[in-house]
Amino acid sequence: MAEENVIYVGNKPVTNYVLAVMTQFSEGADEVKLVARGRAISRAVDVAEFIRNNVMPEVEVKDIEIGTEEIETEEGDTISVSTIAITLAKPSE
């Protein structure tokens, strides 16, 4: 998957990310990956479900990857942050 088909989900409203996914698909992408970590995970799930249920019902969830990243804080401590990557795909025609 090309790097431009990856959408990093953060603190913006869900509709911004829905629009980004729709733009990727309308420009010819077969797959779009939503990547989020920490508190943004629920927002990434909301985006995927909104796309599937309201905007593009033909889109399927192809893959879901979950994991943990080790991040070093400014104080030098190491914390673990949960991550998710949801791959949405148009069905093959």
From Swiss-Prot:
Subcellular location: Cytoplasm; Chromosome
GO molecular function annotation: double-stranded DNA binding; RNA binding
Keywords on record: Chromosome, Cytoplasm, DNA condensation, DNA-binding
Residue pairs linked by disulfide bridges in the UniProt entry: none
Signal peptide positions (record): none
One Pfam family it belongs to: Alba
Superkingdom classification of source: Archaea
GO cellular component term of the entry, any: chromosome
One annotated GO biological process: chromosome condensation
Record-stated family: Belongs to the histone-like Alba family.
Annotated function: Binds double-stranded DNA tightly but without sequence specificity. Involved in DNA compaction.
Protein name: DNA/RNA-binding protein Alba 2
The species this protein was found in: Methanopyrus kandleri (strain AV19 / DSM 6324 / JCM 9639 / NBRC 100938)
Source taxonomy: Archaea, Methanobacteriati, Methanobacteriota, Methanomada group, Methanopyri
GN (gene name): albA2
